[in-house]
């Protein structure tokens, strides 16, 4: 028995019956020899961490565009916070931590520059729309590794695809067919919003857009006064509610779920859609729109002559992969006059 097989046996011996087991993965698009050290989900986690798309997240916006302060979140710090919360829940429920971590680390790989402002801009430009979760799957299936993708397992790709909620989407999917294939995937989905509503409040306070006591009193009473209190309350509630339903689904109690939905609505109304934030979003959208128009009009400058993909698809992949800094620098090079002396 090699090390991988020992680790797989430990999973069967220690994890809950509903936990995803590495040895029972639905597999990959392309068959590969098994590794003698690492189970399948660990290999997926490692591939994501070593990918170029993962490294670029450190220069992509979470909420505030190119913030000058050192302590504002980026897309990378968001991903790490989501993953930490998700692993805490998975460990407490005896679910597969490594699968949870792989999905958490990979869930935003396809996010565009300038956060949701960039996503909204690209959504208007491409036929069929643009969603960061579908682009994240495209990154791991096609774009990484010089067009070969990362060849991740079905469970990781499914968790990445089904993590997103948007402004009004269900926090917990009610219909079984709409849920992730694994409980671990649904853990990342709920951990995503637990992370972002709380760290975005922290960034909003730092930016002077919010005060801690601005959050409605009933929400603070239900969830907690500080970010750490709210995260602790929600994490414990997910664990307790999931245990109470005997792992039928990843759950929250009705009162905490309602308070979280109200907090999300509050954040959209009082931060994400405020004139200050929207004004910067509109600038970012203009940058990406002009870049898209230029790139599609001059594809030979960026993609060469030989490429089977449609120009619009190439342009979207190119622009979605940009960091904020790269997009701004390219915009300045293409559209801002430079002094000759």
Predicted feature descriptions by range:
Residues 99, 103, 108-149:
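A generic, well-ordered mixed alpha/beta core segment in the N-terminal half of proteins
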Residues 1-79, 83-89, 96-97, 130-341:
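Histidine-centered, transition-metal-coordinating active-site segments
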């Amino acid at each position: 028995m090699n090390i991988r097989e020992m680790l797989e046996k430990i999973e069967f011996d220690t994890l809950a019956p509903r936990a995803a087991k590495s040895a029972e993965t639905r597999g990959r698009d392309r068959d590969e020899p098994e590794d003698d050290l690492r189970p399948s989900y660990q290999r997926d986690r490692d591939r994501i961490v070593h990918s170029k798309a993962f490294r670029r997240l450190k220069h992509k916006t979470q909420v505030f565009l190119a913030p000058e302060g050192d302590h504002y979140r980026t897309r990378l710090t968001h991903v790490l916070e989501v993953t930490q919360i998700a692993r805490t829940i998975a460990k407490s429920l005896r679910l597969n931590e490594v699968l949870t971590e792989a999905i958490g680390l990979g869930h935003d790989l396809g996010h565009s520059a300038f956060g949701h402002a960039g996503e909204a801009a690209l959504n208007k430009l491409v036929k069929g729309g643009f969603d960061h979760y579908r682009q994240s799957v495209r990154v791991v299936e096609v774009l990484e590794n010089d067009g070969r993708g990362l060849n991740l397992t079905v469970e990781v790709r499914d968790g990445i695809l089904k993590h997103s909620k948007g402004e009004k989407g269900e926090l917990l999917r009610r219909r079984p067919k709409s849920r992730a294939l694994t409980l671990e995937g649904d853990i990342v989905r709920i951990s995503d919003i637990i992370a972002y509503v709380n760290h975005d409040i922290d960034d909003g306070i730092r930016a002077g857009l919010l005060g801690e006591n601005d959050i409605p009193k009933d929400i603070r009473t239900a969830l907690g006064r500080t970010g750490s209190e709210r995260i602790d309350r929600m994490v414990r509630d997910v664990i307790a509610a999931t245990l109470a339903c005997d792992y039928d689904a990843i759950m929250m109690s009705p009162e905490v779920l309602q308070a979280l939905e109200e907090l999300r609505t509050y954040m959209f109304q009082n931060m994400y859609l405020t004139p200050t934030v929207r004004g910067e979003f509109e600038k970012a959208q203009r940058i990406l729109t002009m870049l898209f128009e230029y790139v599609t009009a001059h594809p030979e400058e960026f993609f060469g002559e030989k490429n089977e993909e449609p120009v619009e698809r190439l342009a979207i992949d190119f622009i979605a992969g940009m960091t904020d800094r790269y997009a701004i620098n390219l915009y300045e090079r293409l559209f801002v006059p430079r002094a000759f002396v």
